[in-house]
Amino acid sequence: ECRWFWGGCNNDADCCKHLECKRKWPHICLWDGTFT
């Protein structure tokens, strides 16, 4: 189950599609800039 926007994460794989794990604190899922 993937993490949604602003969800806590350890790496990009934790986040849902089009989201990436922020490299610096707080480690949350943010939009990665993609649409497809």
From Swiss-Prot:
Record has Secreted as a keyword: yes
GO annotations of cellular component type: extracellular region
Disulfide bonds: C2-C16, C9-C21, C15-C29
Cellular localisation: Secreted
Tissues expressing this chain: Expressed by the venom gland.
Name of the protein in its database record: Mu/omega-theraphotoxin-Pmu1a
One GO molecular-function entry: sodium channel regulator activity
Positions of the record's site feature: Important for interaction with Nav1.7/SCN9A: W4, K22, K24, W31
The entry's keywords: Calcium channel impairing toxin, Disulfide bond, Ion channel impairing toxin, Knottin, Neurotoxin, Secreted, Toxin, Voltage-gated calcium channel impairing toxin, Voltage-gated sodium channel impairing toxin
Family the entry assigns: Belongs to the neurotoxin 10 (Hwtx-1) family.
Entry note about domains: The presence of a 'disulfide through disulfide knot' structurally defines this protein as a knottin.
High-level lineage: Eukaryota, Metazoa, Ecdysozoa, Arthropoda, Chelicerata
Transmembrane segments: none
Pfam families found in the cross-reference section: Toxin_12 (PF07740)
